[in-house]
Amino acid sequence: MSRRKTATKIIDYLEKRINCENIMRYTDEYLDNNSPDKSLVIDEVPVSFTIIPYNANENYSRQLVSTEGDREDKPDFNDIKHMFDVFDFMTEANNTGFEHFPYIYGVLDCLNDIDSTVYVYYEKFDGTLPLLIDNIEHPSDWYDIVFQIVLIIMYIKYVGKMSFKAAPERFLYKKITKPYYKEYSVGDTTLNINHKYLIVCWDTNTTDFEGIQNSESSSENKLPIIDLDFLTEYINVNKDSLKIQPSNRIIKLIQEIKNQPDNIPKILVQYYGPQ
């Protein structure tokens, strides 16, 4: 079953059953006790589940209490509204064919003034990007990983018009049962990329998604900077423990992507095109 069909199935299942009164009872019922991350199994489908407490009181501001040093630092109503907007962006991307975000199966907003809670059901993945990097099986896997990360950040910035504080933990991965080649059109060149993993972007702390600054992309035709320093930093810090380190060519690719944003299409063709 495709990811989209699975999402439709679970969305329909949850809509018919879950409400603010019974959600924790259902959560206990669906809990997979054998899962290290305490995920759920709903209608035989593994599902990730997140609980987000927040303060919906109109007089509360997270930024204000953070500035004043208040011990409470819950998201406020505007934070949650922004999170819903980002979730809508992710869902629209998936529905239009850019399936590099988890499918969101259900979002339940239970308002209760200062003790409000949002419950989020979403597609389960194998783990975060660091787990994948630490356990890469073949040197060529680096090309697959870097390509997908570049696509995701470009989509967020160029299509979504948002800045994004990328970090290894904000990417999830799933190993594909049957690796496949996918065609991508870059200018006049068709790239055939071998995908062994599916990488998606996910973070419920959506304050990291903000409107892109005009200075970062001064014209509609100029590509925004794709900063992969977070990836380089992770590699440098963990290089002694990585099973398979990236080649010098991969490191050069990462550096060129950051330093030459306007040449990204040419760079991708150079590294991924016919040799």
UniProtKB/Swiss-Prot annotation:
Keywords: Virion. This is Uncharacterized protein R691. Its main location: virion. It is found in: Virion. One of its GO terms (cellular component) is virion component. It comes from Acanthamoeba polyphaga mimivirus (APMV).
